[in-house]
Structure formats: C-alpha cells, structure tokens
Amino acid sequence: MAQTLAQTKQISQSHTFDVSQSHHKTPDDTNSHSVIYSTQNLDLWYGENHALQNINLDIYENQITAIIGPSGCGKSTYIKTLNRMVELVPTVKTAGKILYRDQDIFDQKYSKEQLRTNVGMVFQQPNPFPKSIYDNITYGPKIHGIKNKKVLDEIVEKSLRGAAIWDELKDRLHTNAYSLSGGQQQRVCIARCLAIEPEVILMDEPTSALDPISTLRVEELVQELKEKYTIIMVTHNMQQAARVSDKTAFFLNGYVNEYDDTDKIFSNPSNKKTEDYISGRFG
C-alpha cells in the first residue's frame, strides 16, 4: 500500500523555488528540522474583507505548531490556505506564496488533489461518515485505487493503531461510526486521515467539542504523531498550546503578531499584545 500511495504522490518537480530569501524564518534558525511550509507575503480577501495580511511564517517538519489568537483573527482561514480548502469560498482571492517542499501551491500546475493527499485535516467537530468504522478508514485508500481486501484490512489496523484506538474498536469495525463517543469519533477521524499517509496534519480546534478526558487522549496522541507527521493546530485553549506545541504563532487582526518557540511565547513574549492575550486581558 505504501508503494501504491507513494506512486500517487509524485508531484512535478518542474516548478521549484529558492526559499533561502524568506524573511521570516522560524525563531530558532539552528533548528535541525527542515522547513516543510514557507508562507511568504500572503494576503487573502473574502470579497472586500482583508482577512490575512502579509503573513510570513515557516513551519518545520515533525513539530507541532500551535496557531492561537482571538476569534476572527484569521487562524482557521490560514490553515485552510495550506491545503487550499479556502478556495471553496467563491469570493476568496489571494496574493503571495505558500511553498510546500519548495513548490508554490498556488501555481496553476500544482495539483490540489495531490496537495490534499499530502496534507490531511481534522476538523473542530468530529465528522465521521455515516458508515462503519471500517468503511470510514478505507474510504481514502479506495479512492486511490486500493481494492485488495487484505491490504485494506492492514490499512485499517495500522491507521487505528496510529490513532491509539485499535484496542478499543478492533471488535467493532463494522459498527456505525456514529455510535461512538465524541472522543472516539475524533480519533477515528484522525485514523481516517492517517490512512492516506499524509505528511502534514492540519487540526482546527480538534478538542473543543470533547470532554476533558477525551481531550487529554487526543493531546497525548498528537504528541505521539509528531514523530511521523508535522502537526499544525488551531486552538483557543492557551493551556493546550503550552502543553503540546513546539512553536506558537499568535494571530491578531489578520496579522502574525508574534511567532516563536512555545516556551518563550508563554514565559517571555516579545510583544505586549501577545502577553495581554495569553494572560487573558483580552480575547
């Protein structure tokens, strides 16, 4: 299966870009992790609403980057540009570049479908399909042409193990996913995402609808997943960002107000507005 999906993930290398001049590198330039996403001078409009303004941000491989900020600041809009889901909004327009592995995802020759294979997404509300757990997990691989039952069985087990829920569900694979608890549904959605072997997982408030115990399980899972995946997570929960992330970007009014190592953001922020936000003075 890995070979089959790898074959589907070959993107043309004919349009590459030098990212060495990107003027907003991650705060720790000695970091051994490679840049996987480089956002350069990104502006985005919904009609006349200038939702993102001059965003410059580098995301590093195999790290968890938290995106924080008050409601309406552009957090969710930003991560939806990273897999071009934002283009589902008819009035949207963009300027600037987002480089994914040195290729501009807005280039006309860049495949949106391939991008969304490489970059999975988990939403705020658990959104399993109205199908069995098994069919939820195999949905993506089947779209990619995998039909062999043995291979699909292996994908299901591997994905559910990756989402730390195999032992809970291995005897219930043909149960409707809607019958699960909210926390279990969200982990099934994470497993469904893992089944297509992405490199990056975008998470938009993945625990906001969950109880504290389920939230803790998802947070523990996210920290395990960064060994194999790059995680970019929007959260309103300051404690969550501080607990799980390596880097934190604070968005305010469509701008990146501050971006730094999470420890520094929460212990010694450089910007007064960042300090005011994380201390609860506004937001």
Swiss-Prot record:
Residues 1-32 are annotated as: Disordered. GO terms for biological process: phosphate ion transmembrane transport. The keyword rRNA-binding does not apply. It catalyses: phosphate(out) + ATP + H2O = ADP + 2 phosphate(in) + H(+). SUPFAM superfamilies: P-loop containing nucleoside triphosphate hydrolases. One of its GO terms (cellular component) is plasma membrane. Residues 1-20 have a biased composition (Polar residues). ATP binds at residues 69-76. The keyword Iron-sulfur does not apply. One of its GO terms (molecular function) is ATPase-coupled phosphate ion transmembrane transporter activity. InterPro entries: AAA+_ATPase, ABC_transporter-like_ATP-bd, ABC_transporter-like_CS, P-loop_NTPase, PstB-like. Its EC number is 7.3.2.1. It is found in: Cell membrane. Pfam families: ABC_tran (PF00005). Residues 37-278 form the ABC transporter domain. It is a peripheral membrane protein. Keywords: ATP-binding, Cell membrane, Membrane, Nucleotide-binding, Phosphate transport, Translocase, Transport. Part of the ABC transporter complex PstSACB involved in phosphate import. Responsible for energy coupling to the transport system. Belongs to the ABC transporter superfamily. Phosphate importer (TC 3.A.1.7) family. The complex is composed of two ATP-binding proteins (PstB), two transmembrane proteins (PstC and PstA) and a solute-binding protein (PstS). This is Phosphate import ATP-binding protein PstB. The lineage of its organism: Bacteria, Bacillati, Bacillota, Bacilli, Bacillales. The gene is pstB.
